């Protein structure tokens, strides 16, 4: 993975940790207004596939991140596809373990998330 691709993965992980997970946790809804639900693109294999500690799959492209989530009836979230291991900051694993116990994601959804170009936008804690 080259430096450019690694940076995209880092931006994606920060975006999901700061923006997506808190909204899912607080709102208790299955969709978020500013995120468009999409089907997996036919050329998704060209993206970079990563797995977060809470077992969600992220396809990283040059300007979009594809987050694929699947939740089984027993409440556990599983990844779809063969993941690369995503390198995250220390402590991240402990902070997001709760995700597997939140039964708010129904079946399979693909979230198309724009990658913010300015890292400063991701550093703000909400």
From Swiss-Prot:
Location(s) in or outside the cell: Membrane
GO cellular component terms attached to this protein's record: membrane
Keywords assigned by UniProt, alphabetized: Membrane, Transmembrane, Transmembrane helix
Mode of membrane association? Single-pass membrane protein
Tell me which domain of life the UniProt entry assigns to the organism this sequence originates from.
Eukaryota
Parts of the chain that traverse the membrane:
48-68
Q: What is this protein called?
A: Putative uncharacterized protein PRO1933
Q: Which organism is it from?
A: Homo sapiens
């Amino acid at each position: 993975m080259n430096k450019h691709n690694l940076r995209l993965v880092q931006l994606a992980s920060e975006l999901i940790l700061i923006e997506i997970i808190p909204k899912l946790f607080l709102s208790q809804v299955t969709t978020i207004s500013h995120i468009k639900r999409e089907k997996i693109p036919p050329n998704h294999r060209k993206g970079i596939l990563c797995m977060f500690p809470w077992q969600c799959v992220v396809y990283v492209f040059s300007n979009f991140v594809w987050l694929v989530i699947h939740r089984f009836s027993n409440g556990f979230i599983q990844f779809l596809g063969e993941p690369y291991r995503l390198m995250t900051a220390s402590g991240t694993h402990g902070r997001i373990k709760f995700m597997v116990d939140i039964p708010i994601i129904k079946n399979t959804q693909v979230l198309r998330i724009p990658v913010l170009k300015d890292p400063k936008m991701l550093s703000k804690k909400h």
